[in-house]
From Swiss-Prot:
A motif (LPXTG sorting signal) lies at residues 1867-1871. It holds the Pfam family Glucodextran_B. Residues 1793-1805 have a biased composition (Low complexity). Belongs to the peptidase S8 family. It catalyses: Endopeptidase activity with very broad specificity, although some subsite preference have been noted, e.g. large hydrophobic residues in the P1 and P4 positions, and Pro in the P2 position. Best known for its action on caseins, although it has been shown to hydrolyze hemoglobin and oxidized insulin B-chain. The keyword Secreted applies. Keywords: Cell wall, Hydrolase, Peptidoglycan-anchor, Protease, Repeat, Secreted, Serine protease, Signal, Zymogen. The gene is prtP. Residues 1-33 form the signal peptide. GO terms for biological process: proteolysis. This is PII-type proteinase. One of its GO terms (molecular function) is serine-type endopeptidase activity. It is found in: Secreted, Cell wall.
């Protein structure tokens, strides 16, 4: 299905873990925070003793020592000790200035035991007010605004001051002390303290109370001990609220006060717990948002950002093992329900990399809708670093790209807050400590253990350093292990092998465990790696690992203590880069600003199922941090005591969500790059900076003023520009009651203008200042109270600054009240169009050694499906490159390459993408693909694949427009072209790859032998002359040769010159074996040579050995072998206990001979001879025995002339078994293994029992334990002797042993599988499109297996088969929960059956006739019309070319119909043209129509010949006219050429003299020049003639009146005709009328008749008739035969009336369209009425899970929308949608009936799921999934759905932890082709080995 074209799919943005939730504090400020709290929150009013509070405040006082300063600066990421003395003195630090006067708690104004809160506040304010003079003096010294004031338990305030100025502060009158603020490091909340969350809890008591956060993820375990509320009295969502919602929604349920609502949208049941074994992503996310743990042990408790917020468990990922993706329909439903139920914030830690920003994307549209309802959306940015970081997915650019963005969809949503990830300061994770108990102490160091089961597997073991051949630390190759590894912990180095192989080889060597040492030379722990879970393994950093290696090398016999335990450690990554290296770069590909903000996401400790915890990393972890913070902000807005509460209550919809986002971005703290002189980290990486939750809350409580760009976004998007002066405007909003002025920050670092740079040594991206660049305001920034001000700014760049670079930075504004505002800006200086969309062949990304072939042609063999890299050649140094002149394929079915496609490395996201094939003249042959967008290429770390755009293949055929058939294109040069527009640009780029279509094999002649002797050694060569006239000889110079049937399949040829007629002289060296087979005589030579298109020539010849003139006997294959066995070439067994050995050779005469048998008896050879080729064959009988034989060959039948004698040994005695036993003779077993024993004959070399090689003892006895599976097992035992003879015995053993009764317990028939099943009306045999019913059949493994589908128990028959039905309707994505169990075990597992279907084909209405031919003389033909469908996606193909498609990522459950206006040009060929138009929907239902058009070029016809009936005087003259050619029609005009009409068959009767014009016309619209014929021989004023004229005019008047009354002509020309008629009547009525006057009146009236314009022109008539036909087909008989109550006619009759009116032409097109619209409105109403009438209220009022509305509402919405449409084709699309809805509702009604009858053992269901699936009990995972292997702990977005786009050539799939692309890849596989050309001996060998001739990808290290 082409719904989701996303480069790998939506994944959970993090799979790395939550470090302890905690943060850097604010010195003595921990005490100060408590003080601040007392004056603001009533809960402290009478509960804290003043003395106690004072103690808490003053205990933290510290001397201003260097150590204290260093500690404070370290918390800000500054190494104080690395500063010089001047810098140390100039450094600003935080201090507390304490006053001499006593605080309120000590000055006697308060009684601490019972003073009220109001009194405390009042007296505290007095103390603070008295600080004014001292503050002013302090600010004079510090040049900084004083910070927070407090006056209850401490009389003082905070400020920043340079170290050198601290003594000055102490000298100010009224100052008691100046105390350096201390830094505290809480051990349980590192991430929270990074963003000042705890200060919010402490100062404001905001913890999320009264807020709801929706967690759209993999699920939540609501029973976790940390999923709690401290008090559930004032929750936002009560149980009543939830049950009210679920009563309407008809899904989901209430769980706990903490998790009040949840639903599994993926499986359509109430199981909201994620049953993934390794890690539960959604549970981790939920903990970060709102865990509310208790206790002091940070490893056993977590407190989230908003611990008192309620969480919604919106599970959108299935528990099925068959799929780890989700679809748009599922995701959109969860988003919509989040808004409906009243979530304040929704979090989506998921996405598809490198997304766009279009509302056509259903998820982005749903996010906007949620914003409009007031629900804020917070979404992860993604974990792919940059697109230029190759396989690493980090902050690097190896390619020098201008476009490195990777932010994923739906994080690109304009209204969402998109979150980047910063590293946590500390990390809780498994850590290892290694010691010998005295001298050695390594660690603790963070590790990733392969399984928690192995924590004790390394302790007190000996260690073994694995070394390679050079004595260095081995990378783990199997050959490097020795027997010493057994029982020890092996140590190897990272590199070359993937981790799983390293584990496998260590385990195979008998090691007890494995330690892998990193290879980067740093102290960075080796984590985030992919290990199997079955062998004890972990990694160490390079430095720690080397120390261990050194120790073990010196102490090889020591046993070491190894402790592995959860430990809180400093985060090594934080010291290297505060940002997480994986966080995805922005901006959006159209230069919109993203990401928005940064939060802690690297190494986060959070919750898991069953009261568990783990560490994970990713933007998945950063996003919920922001979601929790926005819950706190929302709580602040809802606080009625907030001074701005009244203003906040006015915020609704997007105004509210945009405000939350703006406040957080305006108060964020930009992060500096510690590796590059503390310059800023790019806003494209960090957004507005690290969230500061306290600063945001402070703003909401004190001054919520904001600054945004002119477009309202809290970041300036400069887009692309080329002028060095760029102006932009900012809007400042003052929400206070006093005027505010702002100054730009004077810090030159903060306020500098930056651009991007790349470290040449490491590829790391960083920002650098642009010297000479500046931003200045155009005026002072003054904002009146309660007003806004728009200020213009100018960005100035130096004239020398090069274009094609980013320009970015931060604008920091200091307010007159001490407030600060932060605003990032970003733009591109240059033309955004200019960056290439596609990497070239052998381009910057091309790296075969790294497994990346970049942009490369792919050639496919149709028989095998194997793919090969086109044009790939290897030079002398082994370097592979693509030679674009060698790219070719063949239309010959016998060739290896049968079609061509392209693997594109897209450097950018592109839109309006088209892929064409052009011929050698640049003419378009076909359009292979047309798509709205394609995603750039990137490396997906989880699937370990590059996500390329794999464009469709061309097989060398084309649509022949002349007859409508598909034909093979001519050989020649062609071009494979891709074109598209870079996202954000407006210029189309084109990238061409040349190739050749070549169906003819090369010609080869003059095959011969030559020889060269060097240093006494003779080298023989097979030479030839070869030529290929199109694609050229194989550029790899590969050739296969055979000499006397001795082959060399890996030979290469060299060019030895060119002949005069263009042949290439080639020579190929013979192998040593071939040279030895040469004889003096007729040597048989074969040369197998291909061209670049893979056409093969197999040329054989008889050649003489160079230098030899004699013709001796030659036996092929080097002669008769020394031994003849069953494996010898030429041996063929028979059924009589022996066989035949056949050999061949050459000799100038007939050959005869003899051989001896097993008894030594001599026999004649059976020989044949071909005199034409001097070749012979001979055969001899052999018996199944071992004996010596002699063969003699003679030149005569008398056997007197001996040519050659051979001695050979016949070895055909096969090995034998003695006492062979399987399972001790029993056919049955209940064990996991059986024993196979026996003895073999002494000549046996090996015994294979299944896949096991049995060990043979001295008596040739063997015994092997063979594993067996449940059911029948065929065990084969094969003995092989030294001669290759084999004997095989086999037996079938039936096993009842089944360690996992649920594994593969259920299988389905007819291709149905767990997970997604996509089909259309004709592609699934189990589905009936007429009823919408699917009948699912299958079989279970055990009689004890139980099966539940959609909450209903399925009956299992005695033969273990089952059958049940599901009501699927005709359109949609329907998930059904499945539970499989076993009555013998108390466990089940959950799966899902998801059906994605569309059983309704699109409608297609064309404006041109499809019944009758169309004729034209215009070569440019326009195909116009409309197509509709019941779903939103349509693609259009014309003549086999895919010319248009709509946005493919649709929500198939939306109920929105599809509509496509068709307006496509076609270039006509001369003569007949058959134009085929096909429209296809999302599930490949196709409707096709054909238009036949005849075209001839415009030409001038020969004039007709006019002949009068007489030239003599007469009363009348008849003029006849003949055209010059057949097929032409002659027309005449009597009004001087104003109008023409056909000449009647009898001619034109003329009654008055005058001039008549005649011209010829044809069907194509061609005309001849008009010729005049002047009639002068009419006798004037003859009474008879006058009477004739009167009669003619009378007749014409009558005809005119008939025409006027017909109603077929438009009003204007009908009115003109009436006037002409009246004028003619007046002339007729004149008593003195003359022949001339009457003739003139006749002529004028005829002109008016000729000028009548039809109400319905022919072209519009054809279009309308086609449309009416489509409507009738859509109605069918059932609906068509229903009666319209307003007319009393059936709808079919009404349509027939319209057809008749159209045929008659009595209505205009608009009138007919209006009438059709009325009919369709009536049809829609009738259909809707019928559906509603057939739907009981309990069903009609139930919720449609797909739309979230009731069925009645769905019906009404579709009806209303359809009737509101003005376009008939759109009404038709709504009719289709309503018909689909009818099927769905009917299914729902039937399901309700079934439910009312009780248990339905057939399992019929219509809901696409249900509520009957039980949730697993606490502690039970709900599934026994077996070992799936561990996943990497590096971030990744969970994929939403498999992408089946044209960017991949096979189905896209993903896992929860990462994306995985599709594509066949270019890996050739080994298989025999199904058809073989009629080649000779060598040709047959070569063709059978074609599959191994392609390129192999090197296995890469993970």
């Amino acid at each position: 299905m082409q719904r989701k074209k996303k480069g790998l799919s939506i994944l959970l943005a993090g799979t790395v873990a939550l470090g302890a939730l905690a943060v850097l504090p604010v010195g003595e400020i921990q005490a100060k925070a408590a003080i601040s709290q007392q004056t603001k929150v009533s809960s402290l009013a009478n509960t804290v003793k003043a003395a106690t509070a004072k103690q808490a405040a003053t205990d933290t006082t510290a001397a201003t020592t260097n150590q204290a300063i260093a500690t404070q600066l370290a918390a800000k990421g500054i190494d104080y000790n690395k500063l010089n003395k001047v810098q140390q003195q100039d450094t600003y630090v935080d201090v507390i200035v304490q006053m001499s006067a006593a605080p309120a708690s000590e000055n006697g104004t308060l009684r601490t035991d019972y003073s009220s809160t109001a009194e405390i506040q009042q007296e505290t304010n007095k103390v603070i007010a008295a600080q004014a003079s001292v503050k002013a003096a302090v600010e004079q010294v510090t040049q900084q605004t004083a910070g927070e004031s407090y006056g209850y338990v401490v009389n003082g305030f905070s400020t920043k001051v340079r170290v050198v100025d601290i003594p000055k502060l102490k000298q100010i009158a009224g100052v008691k002390t100046v105390t350096l603020a201390k830094v505290y490091y809480p051990t349980d909340a590192k991430a929270n303290s990074m963003a000042n969350v705890q200060a919010v809890w402490s100062n404001y008591k905001y913890k999320g109370e009264g807020t709801v956060v929706s967690v759209i993820d993999t699920g939540i375990d609501p029973t976790h001990k940390d999923m709690r509320l401290s008090d559930d009295k004032d929750v936002k969502l009560t149980k009543y609220d939830v049950e009210k919602f679920t009563d309407t929604a008809k899904h989901g349920r209430y769980f706990t006060s903490k998790v009040p609502y949840g639903f599994n949208y993926a499986d359509n049941n109430d199981t909201i717990t994620d049953d993934t074994v390794d890690e539960q992503h959604g549970m981790h996310v939920a903990g970060i948002i709102g865990a509310n743990g208790t206790g002091d042990d940070p490893t056993k408790s977590v407190v989230g950002v908003a611990p008192e917020a309620q969480l919604l468990a919106m599970k959108v990922f299935t528990n099925s093992d068959t799929s780890a993706t989700t679809g748009s329909a599922t995701l959109v439903s969860a988003i919509e329900d989040s808004a409906k139920i009243g979530a304040d914030v929704l979090n989506m830690s998921l996405g598809s990399d490198s997304g766009n920003q279009t509302l056509e994307d259903p998820e982005i549209a749903a996010v906007q809708n949620a914003n409009e309802s007031g629900t804020a959306a917070v979404i992860s940015a993604g974990n792919s670093g940059t697109s230029g970081s190759a396989t690493q997915g980090v902050n690097k650019d190896y390619y020098g790209l201008q476009d490195n963005e990777m932010v994923g969809t739906p994080g690109t949503s304009r209204g969402a807050t998109t979150v980047a990830s910063a590293e946590n300061t500390d990390v809780i994770s498994q850590a290892v400590t290694i010691t010998d108990g005295k001298d050695l102490q390594l660690g603790p160091e963070t590790i990733q253990l392969s399984s928690n089961d192995f924590t004790g597997s390394f302790d007190q073991k000996k260690f073994y350093v694995v070394k390679d051949a050079s004595g260095d630390l081995s990378k783990g190759a199997a050959a490097d292990y020795t027997a010493d590894a057994k029982g020890k912990i092996a140590i190897v180095k990272r590199g070359e092998l993937n981790f799983a192989d390293k584990q496998k080889y260590a385990q195979a060597a008998g090691a007890a465990g494995l330690i892998i040492v990193n290879n980067d030379g740093t102290a960075t722990p080796l984590t985030s790696i992919r290990l199997t879970t079955t062998f004890p393994t972990f990694g160490l950093s390079s430095k720690t690992g080397q120390k261990l290696v050194d120790w073990v090398t010196a102490h090889p016999d020591d046993s070491l203590g190894v402790k592995i335990a959860l430990t809180l450690l400093p985060n090594q990554k934080y010291t290297e880069d505060k940002m997480s290296d994986f966080t995805s770069y922005g901006p959006v590909s159209n230069l919109s600003f993203k990401p928005d903000i940064t939060a802690p996401g690297g190494n986060i400790w959070s919750t898991q199922n069953n009261n568990g915890y783990t560490n994970m990393s990713g933007t998945s972890m950063a996003s919920p941090f922001i979601a929790g913070s926005q819950a706190l902000l929302k709580q602040a807005l809802n606080n009625k005591n907030n001074p701005f509460y009244a203003d906040y209550k006015q915020l609704k919809g997007t105004a509210l969500t945009d405000f939350l986002k703006t406040v957080e971005m305006n108060t964020a703290q930009p992060i500096n790059d510690i590796n590059y002189n503390n310059v800023i980290v790019s806003p494209r990486r960090q957004g507005a900076g690290l969230v500061d939750v306290k600063a945001a809350i402070d703003a909401l409580e004190k001054n919520p003023s904001t600054v945004v760009a002119e477009n309202g976004y809290p970041a300036v998007e400069l887009k692309d520009f080329t002028s060095t002066d760029k102006t932009f405007k900012l809007t400042f909003t003052n929400r206070t009651t006093h005027e505010l002025t702002y100054q730009m920050d004077s810090n030159t670092d903060t306020n500098a203008v930056y651009t991007s740079a790349t470290d040449p040594n490491s590829g790391v991206l960083y920002d650098k200042k642009i010297d000479g660049a500046a931003i200045k305001a155009g005026s002072d920034i003054t904002v009146p109270a309660g007003k806004t001000a728009q200020i213009e700014f100018t960005l100035s760049l130096p004239k020398s600054f090069d274009q094609q670079q980013f320009v970015e930075g931060f604008l920091n504004f200091k307010g007159s009240d001490g407030s600060r505002l932060n605003l990032p800006y970003m733009g591109f200086f240059g033309d955004w169009n200019d960056g290439k969309i596609v990497d070239s062949l052998n381009g910057i990304t091309y790296s075969p050694a790294g497994g990346n072939y970049g942009t490369v042609p792919l050639l496919t063999n149709k028989n095998t499906g194997h793919q090969y890299y086109g044009g790939m050649v290897t030079d002398a140094d082994g370097k592979q490159t693509v030679d674009d002149q060698a790219i070719a394929f063949s239309s010959d079915k016998n060739a290896l390459y049968n079609d061509i496609s392209m693997q594109y490395y897209l450097l950018r996201n592109i839109s309006n993408v088209q892929v064409d094939i052009l011929d050698g003249q640049g003419n378009k042959v076909t359009t292979l693909s047309s798509s709205t967008n394609q995603t750039k290429t990137y490396y997906d770390a989880h699937s370990q694949k590059y996500i390329y755009y794999n464009a469709p293949a061309w097989d060398g055929t084309y649509y022949d427009q002349r007859d409508g058939n598909i034909k093979t294109a001519d050989d020649g040069s062609y071009t494979y072209r891709i074109s598209g527009v870079p996202e954000g640009g407006d210029k189309r780029q084109v990238f061409d790859v040349p190739f050749k279509l070549d169906s003819k094999a090369p010609t080869v002649r003059h095959v011969a032998l030559s020889a060269k002797t060097e240093n006494g050694k003779t080298q023989y060569y097979l030479t030839a002359e070869a030529k290929d006239d199109l694609s050229g000889l194989d550029a790899t110079k590969s050739v296969k040769t055979a000499i006397n049937e001795v082959t060399n399949l890996d030979a290469t040829f060299t060019d030895a010159g060119t002949t005069a007629d263009g042949y290439t002289k080639i020579e190929t060296p013979l192998s040593d074996e071939q040279a030895q087979a040469l004889g003096n005589g007729d040597n048989s030579a074969e040369l197998y040579l291909t061209d670049n298109a893979s056409n093969a020539t197999n040329q054989d010849a008889s050649v003489q050995k160079p230098g030899s003139t004699s013709f001796d006997l030659i036996v092929n294959g080097g002669g008769i072998p020394d031994k003849i066995s069953s494996t010898t070439t030429g041996y063929e067994a028979n059924t009589q206990g022996g066989g035949t050995y056949t050999f061949s050779g050459t000799y100038p005469a007939a050959v005869d001979g003899t051989y001896t048998d097993a008894q030594g008896k001599k026999h004649d050879l059976n020989t044949t001879y071909d005199a034409a080729t001097n070749s012979f064959t001979a055969s001899m009988a052999v018996t199944n025995a071992d004996y010596a034989a002699q063969v003699d060959l003679y030149a005569d039948k008398a056997h007197t002339q001996l040519l050659k004698h051979f001695d050979t040994k016949v070895r055909l005695t096969a090995p034998t078994f003695t006492d062979l036993k399987f399972n001790n003779g029993s056919d049955q077993t209940s064990e996991a293994t059986i024993k196979v024993t026996g003895t073999v004959s002494s000549d046996t070399k090996t015994v294979n029992v299944g896949d096991t090689v049995a060990a043979l003892d001295a008596q040739h006895h063997f015994s092997v334990d063979v594993p067996v599976n449940y059911g029948d097992n065929t065990i084969k035992v094969t003995a092989t002797d030294e001669d290759g003879n084999t004997t095989t015995e086999q037996k079938t053993i039936t096993s009842s042993y089944d360690p996992d009764v649920l594994k593969n317990a259920v299988t389905f028939d007819q291709g149905v599988k767990f997970g997604a099943n996509e089909f259309n009306a004709t592609s699934a045999k189990f589905y009936d499109p007429k009823t919408g019913i699917a009948t699912i059949t299958g079989k279970v493994k055990h009689p004890t297996t139980t099966l539940q589908v959609d909450g209903k128990q399925i009956s299992i028959k005695n033969d273990l088969t089952f059958s049940f039905t599901l009501d699927l309707g005709t359109l949609g994505q329907k998930p059904f929960g499945v539970v499989v169990g076993d009555t013998t075990q108390n466990k089940t597992f959950q799966e899902a059956l998801t059906f994605i279907l569309d059983a309704v084909a699109p409608t297609l209405s064309l404006d041109s006739s499809t019944d009758a031919p169309v004729y034209t003389n215009d070569p440019n033909f326009q195909i116009t019309g409309t197509a509709t469908d019941n779903a939103q996606y349509l693609s259009l193909a014309i003549n086999g070319s895919h010319v248009a498609s709509q946005y493919a990522d649709i929500n198939i459950n939306s109920g929105k119909p599809g509509h496509m206006a068709i307006d496509q040009p076609v270039k006509l060929l001369e003569g007949k043209n058959v134009l085929t138009v096909a429209v296809t929907d999302s599930e490949n239902n196709t409707t096709t129509k054909k238009i036949t058009v005849y075209y001839e070029p415009k030409k001038t016809l020969a004039a007709p010949t006019v002949t009068p009936s007489t030239t003599e005087p007469a009363k009348t003259v008849t003029l006849t006219a003949n055209a010059a050619a057949t097929g032409e029609t002659v027309q005449y005009s009597a009004d001087g050429g104003k109008t023409y009409q056909d000449v009647p068959a009898a001619g034109v009767t003329v009654t008055a003299n005058g001039t008549f014009k005649f011209k010829s016309t044809d069907l194509y619209g061609n005309e001849s020049p008009a010729v005049d014929y002047v009639v002068t021989n009419i006798k004037a004023d003859d009474p008879a003639q006058l009477q004739t004229a009167k009669q003619a005019l009378t007749n014409l008047i009558a005809s005119a009146k008939t025409l006027s009354a017909s109603g077929k002509y438009d009003d204007a020309t009908t009115t003109a005709l009436a006037a002409a008629t009246q004028k003619a009547q007046t002339a007729l009525d004149q008593t003195d009328a003359s022949v001339d006057s009457l003739t003139g009146a006749n002529r004028d009236l005829q002109t008016a008749i000729n000028q009548l314009a039809a109400k319905l022109p022919a072209d519009k008539k054809t279009s309308l008739l086609n449309q009416l036909q489509s409507v009738k087909a859509a109605l069918g008989t059932d609906l068509g035969n229903q009666t319209d109550p307003s007319t009393g006619k059936t709808f079919t009759a009404a349509l027939d009336d319209l057809v008749a009116q159209a045929q008659a032409g009595t209505q205009t097109a608009d009138q007919l369209q209006a009438s059709l619209a009325k009919v369709l409105d009536a049809v829609l109403a009738k259909l809707a009425e019928g559906i509603k009438a057939a739907t009981p209220a309990e069903v009609g009022n139930a919720k449609d899970a797909a739309t979230g509305k009731t069925w009645y509402a769905d019906i009404a919405d579709t009806l209303t929308s359809g009737q509101a449409s003005a376009d008939a084709s759109d009404k038709l699309a709504h009719l289709q949608a309503l018909q689909s809805l009818k099927t769905k509702v009917a299914a729902a009604v039937e399901a309700a009936k079934t439910a009312g009858k009780g248990d339905d053992t057939t399992g019929t269901s219509d809901k696409g799921g249900g509520q009957g699936t039980p949730a697993p009990a606490p502690g039970d995972t709900g599934k026994d999934k077996g070992d799936e292997g561990s996943q990497p702990s590096s971030g990744g977005n969970i994929p939403t759905k498999p992408a089946t786009t044209t960017s991949t050539s096979t189905d896209d799939t993903t896992d929860r932890n990462g994306q995985h692309t599709s594509g066949k890849g270019a890996l050739p596989k080994t298989a025999e082709t199904t058809e073989r050309p009629a080649f000779g001996f060598l040709g047959v060998i070569v063709v059978s080995l074609m599959g191994v001739l392609g390129l192999k990808r090197k296995q890469r290290e993970e």
